[in-house]
Amino acid sequence: MNLSLAYLGPTGTNSETAAIAYADWLTAHHQQQSTLCPYPSIALALQSVAQGQISQAVVPIENSIEGSVTVVLDILWRTDNLQVHQELTLPIFHGLLSYAASLEQIKTVYSHPQGLAQCQQWLESFLPQVQLIPTKSTTEGIKFLKEDLTAAAVSSPRAAQLYQVPLLKADIKDRPDNCTRFWIVSCEKSDRGNYLSLAFSLPKNAPGALVKALEIFARREINLSKIESRPSKRSLGEYVFLIDLEGNSQDIQIKEALTELSQCTEVLKIFGNYSKLPIP
């Protein structure tokens, strides 16, 4: 059976690189063939899975410079049938693509907001006067370059090769260790792996309510590798709390913790148990 993989397109995005890496891993380890299916937005990629049109989605969840990709967290929170199955981490490379002969000619730079943010210091240092225009992906802005010799795009060196656009500067990311976590999401129940992500809301904004919830894990010495909050989108000051922890939902300690947590939270959602793929 052929597996369909949704991701943020078009061709040349970092999400496509992650989808290809995952597809290659499936072929090498499970003899599973995959079809890559680009979508114009992360939301539409996840929606295609939730509606049963596509088998799985490969979506970015966190960048080492810019932090969480909040659209993914928000969709997982409000969509009941999506589950995280695997995680992979890839290094991210950003270059400046342009037909301009020099930096001095550039007046406009296109890229996805994450791409612009991950190169913010470089752009402020070398192109402080340019107009930054956000696009849906790091490759969408490339289509404007041939018609405008004063325009540039922040995208990957791989995209420069695919679209045959000159790479004016090969490496402009702010930090050399820039990398992004990607989640593999499907509608199948996920309870395998040694990592677990969940989210919860509290019944009321009372003193100590969050501490009480976190103490459930502390008492059992369960390691929380990440804690963050997102607006509930209901009213100002209401939040959803998101946690990554190490362990499996079937472990006795974690099972007890989740049972107790469900008793002191308004809504508790398990995004999934998953393993981290050894993809370099």
Where do the language-model regions lie?
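Domain-level signature for soluble enzymes in the chorismate/prephenate branch of the shikimate pathway
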Residues: 1-280
